[in-house]
Every structure is written in C-alpha cells, then in structure tokens.
Amino acid sequence: MEFEELIELARDSYVGQFVNFADTQLKAYPEGTPEIKVMVAEDSGLYRGLYCADFITVDPEESESPRIIELAPEEEVTFEPIEVTLGEMEMTVEALSWHDMNLTLADAPMPHEGGGVQGIEAWFETWFDPDDVNVDLDSRFSGHIHSLIIDGDNLHVDFGTAPVQALIDLLLLIEMNGCTGVKVF
C-alpha cells in the first residue's frame, strides 16, 4: 500500500470513529458540542496554548463547569514500517495515529519562540484556524487539527477532523526547511 493510501486510511478510520463518538455523546448530552476550541495555560505545552476538545458538555447532575470528553479510538491502521522519500527528506513511517501523530525531525530547526521551522505559524493558522476564519457552514465538523505540541525535536499533532492535506502541508513545510529525516510514529 502506498503512503498516500495509508494516510487516507488512517484519517478515514479516525473520522469515522469520531462521527460515531460525536453521535453517542450528543445522545447522552444533547446540550454538548463537538470540536470546541479552548485556551489553556501557556505552560501546557500546547502551541499558543490552544486546543480543540473533541466534545464539551455541562452535566448539571455532576457540576456546572464544562466537562471535556475525548475520543479514545478503538481502531488504528496497522502496517509494517515503511520508508518514504519526499524531496530531499527521508521518512521512516512506523505508525499513523491520526489523533496522536508523533514526528521526530533530524537536521532541521524546530519551531519554537524566536526561531525554527519557517512557516509553522501560518500552517497552524490554516489548519487549527484559531479565529474560525475558514468555517464551512455546510460541514458537520471543523476540518481542523485539534492540537500541536512542539517538544525539542518532536512534533505531536492531533489532526482531528482535518483533511489529509494538513499532514501533507506539514511534511512539505518540514522538507522545505531543510530537514533530511523524519520518523513518524
């Protein structure tokens, strides 16, 4: 199976489970809402302190404060590790967990305050869309990533309901910044 097909399969598997999850939560908590963006403490490690919760509700019997419920996918795409070349960048792909994708970068500046991968801010603005500038009112879900964590040479991304293009754009951005190796797990 080609890398592009694996990405599509990983995304489709996750989003299918997300649809079922959202339906189940809405039945249990009709006042709840899927995909709500929240700001958390800056020291949380989340990029710009932003996070999109899978589902938020208020359960009057338990508390008046919001309750976040996260999807724990039961299925994930499994395959033997593969090697993929993107321009000058060699990738070892061991796993594609759409809701919890980890990328370890080699030989590239990391995106962080004061420097790093050029363009990560614009990528985040596009694919997290903090101000909900690109909202498709005809779509049930946002089509955005749910979080980005930058930790040294590692990126951790919850791609949420974002399309495959979000991952492709991130990989292209990393490659354009001179990264010669990426491990995806």
Regions found by a protein language model. Give the residues of each.
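Structured alpha/beta or helical-core interaction and ligand-binding surfaces enriched in interleaved
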Residues: 1-185
